Amino acid sequence: MKVSVLITLAVLGVMFVWTSAAEQEDHGSDRRDSPALLKSLGRVFQSEERACRELLGGCSKDSDCCAHLECRKKWPYHCVWDWTFGNEKS
């Protein structure tokens, strides 16, 4: 009885290690590809026509900040979210 329990536990342990290694291998390829993916996404979000400051960028007035951002009224002055979505900002 004890031998069969030990064999069962050993088989389960080997199966766990085997599936964990296979899963790690699958996720490893995602990690290798992620820098290239992030670099390509960075190009998508960069805009040559953007003359505004992004979130937490320094500012002196609301018009310095991008859409849906406003200049913080107290020091330190930087762009913060103005709690609007879509085309709500007037």
UniProtKB/Swiss-Prot annotation:
Function: Gating-modifier toxin that inhibits voltage-gated sodium channel Nav by shifting the threshold for channel activation to more positive potentials. This toxin moderately inhibits human Nav1.7/SCN9A (IC(50)=360 nM) and weakly inhibits hNav1.2/SCN2A (37% inhibition at 1 uM peptide) and hNav1.5/SCN5A (<20% inhibition at 1 uM peptide). Inhibition of Nav1.7 is voltage-dependent, with lower inhibition at more positive test pulses.
Pfam families: Toxin_12
Subcellular location: Secreted
Name under which the protein is recorded: Mu-theraphotoxin-Phlo1b
Residue ranges annotated as propeptide in the record: 23-50, 86-90
Keywords: Amidation, Cardiotoxin, Disulfide bond, Ion channel impairing toxin, Neurotoxin, Secreted, Signal, Toxin, Voltage-gated sodium channel impairing toxin
Residue(s) carrying Phenylalanine amide: 85
Region forming the signal peptide: 1-22
Record-annotated disulphide pairs: 52-66, 59-71, 65-79
GO molecular function, one term: ion channel inhibitor activity
Domains (record comment): The presence of a 'disulfide through disulfide knot' structurally defines this protein as a knottin.
Family, as annotated: Belongs to the neurotoxin 10 (Hwtx-1) family. 39 (Jztx-34) subfamily.
Tissue: Expressed by the venom gland.
InterPro entries: Huwentoxin-1
SUPFAM superfamilies, A to Z: omega toxin-like
Record bears the keyword Secreted: yes
GO cellular component: extracellular region
